[in-house]
Amino acid sequence: MFRGATTLSLDSKGRLAIPAKYRHALSLDCEGKMVCTIDIKQPCLLLYPLPEWQIIEQKLTRLSSMNPAERRLQRLLLGHADDCEMDKNGRLLLSAPLRQHAGLEKKLMLVGQLNKFEVWNEDAWHEQVAQDMDVEREGDFTLNERLEDFSL
C-alpha cells in the first residue's frame, strides 16, 4: 500500500526515481512493471502497479463501446495508458504526452493513494491541497453515504 507525498525531480530524459521505500514492494509485487495514465478529473497522472491496472482494465472491458460516456472513459484512460518499467536504478520513464497532461517539469510530487500513485506538478499539488483544505474549513460540502460513517 502506498501512502504519503514525496517531492521528486524529473531528469533530463523525463524519468522519475521511485523512492526506495516502495522499490522492494514494487519489485516483488509486479517486477517493477507499472502502467501510467491520465486522471480525467485532475491535472495529474495515475501510476498503477501492473496487477492493479489489470483490475481497472477488466472493469473497462465490461463497458459498452456503444454508450458515449463509457466509450469516452475507455478512450481517455486506455488511449493514454503507457507501460512503464522500473530500471535497475528504480527509475520510470514518463512519456512526453503524459508529462504534458500533468504539466510536469523539473519538480513533481509522487502521492501514495493506497493501490496507486498520483503524479503531480509540485506547484499544482500544493494548490490542490490548499483548495481541498479551504473546502473542508468552510464546511461547504455534502457527505455521501460512505463518508457519513467515516471517522478518524
UniProtKB/Swiss-Prot annotation:
It is found in: Cytoplasm, Nucleoid. Residues 5-52, 81-124 form the SpoVT-AbrB domain. GO terms for molecular function: DNA-binding transcription factor activity; transcription cis-regulatory region binding. Keywords: Cytoplasm, DNA-binding, Repeat, Transcription, Transcription regulation. GO terms for cellular component: cytoplasm; nucleoid. Belongs to the MraZ family. This is Transcriptional regulator MraZ. The gene is mraZ.
